[in-house]
Amino acid sequence: MKKLLAIGILCIMVTAVMSGCVSEKEININNSNKITTNMPVSEKNITKILKYAKNMNLIYYDENGNIVNPYNGDKWKYKVFIDATGQKFLLKNKDDPVPSWAKEKLGDNFKVINVPLTRVIVMSSTEIALMEAINDDGSVIGSVKGIMWGKSYKWYFKDINKSLAEGKIIDVGSSSNPNWDKIIEINPQVIFVYPGYDGDKIIAKCKELGITYVADAEYLENDPLGRCEWVKMFAAFYNKEPEAKRYFEKVEDNCLKVINKTKNCPKVTVAWGYNSQWGCYVPENNSYVAKEIMFYCNGDYIFKDLNGTGSAKINYETFAERAKDADVWVVPSSTAWLSTFKEDNPGYETFKAVKNGRVFCESDDYWQLGLLKTDEVIMDLATILHPEAFKGRKTHFFLKYNIENNTATPFIAK
């Protein structure tokens, strides 16, 4: 499952970002680490909830149907969420009526959900990650009654481990073969599901059984902060807007600080990828991974001329020809999956990054905790690219990889 998730997250749609320039609108970061753009004043909508996420829509209303923004301190009465498949949801507190203006604004095809949710099923550990961000009182994770792949891999969230062991959360099978009898028995208010891959089959079955699903397309976002901003979707379903605001503003602020800290650093060339039994995959130049490298961390990605929004499968010879001269080589996997790395990547010992000890891999918990700690992931990446700017910092998610004995240790910048 971890491998499938890793490949799936790499294969995403993203906004074009080239080294030294910013996609769409020019972005400036002032001394207070706040983003400003050159967009017209009319576009600076004070009621806009989402700054980075593009695959959903979220609107808040007062009781009279006026748009408000709780992230600016406004009081709300109703919420409208439009998921990645275009479904419209009116979210309201249990005792509140459906407002008279609902059909005028939403049409006839919308679903009403009482919030906060108390009984849900999730498809992925990355959904759990964003739920953890707003789980201050335990009620959000407490609402999770079923998880796909629940007992199929190690969990790095202690509360999930405990609830699975105690039977408070049920493993409802894999995403490719869910146990629908268990799912029906749980009778969830909502199943959070990823569209695409196995998710489309789950969506079809939910429609057949009359089970409400919400399509979470965080993994398709074009920016690491766009992925992280899906925390606001979960906040809407749990009335946790204040918690989401505190969490996201902290993550955003830390990420913007990285941009400011690295923008004047000398560029280093970065190879990202490796060869395995599944082939050699590399991020395309418009992928969120390439954006992390080039925009957030001021690196020079070796395949910045490879157009696309996800990942591309290339032959190893093509990869090696460029990677051999890269300053830094990031192997996007953990050592648990790299036992045949030396055999799969012939000639690696001649690579510049190998000779200079600048090969890095991912931590075991990267695919669970990484989304929750988006800012730490970006800070880690910046640290291994520009150690001179982060002296004394110890990494967690990107580890120094010892190819010869397939081990990895935290990197301390000097």
From Swiss-Prot:
Q: Which GO terms describe its cellular component?
A: plasma membrane
* Main subcellular location of this protein, as a coarse class: membrane
Q: What is the lineage of its organism?
A: Archaea, Methanobacteriati, Methanobacteriota, Methanomada group, Methanococci
Which topology term describes how it sits in the membrane? Lipid-anchor
Protein name according to UniProt: Uncharacterized lipoprotein MJ0878
Which parts of the sequence belong to the Fe/B12 periplasmic-binding domain?
119-389
The residues forming the signal peptide are 1-20
| InterPro entries linked to this entry | ABC_Transporter_SBP, ABC_transptr_periplasmic_BD
One of its Pfam families is: Peripla_BP_2
Q: Where in the cell is it found?
A: Cell membrane
Does the keyword section mention Amino-acid biosynthesis? no
What keywords is this UniProt entry annotated with? Cell membrane, Lipoprotein, Membrane, Signal
Give yes or no: UniProt keyword Ligase: no
Question: Which species is listed as the source?
Answer: Methanocaldococcus jannaschii (strain ATCC 43067 / DSM 2661 / JAL-1 / JCM 10045 / NBRC 100440) (Methanococcus jannaschii)
Q: Where is the lipid attached (S-archaeol cysteine)?
A: C21
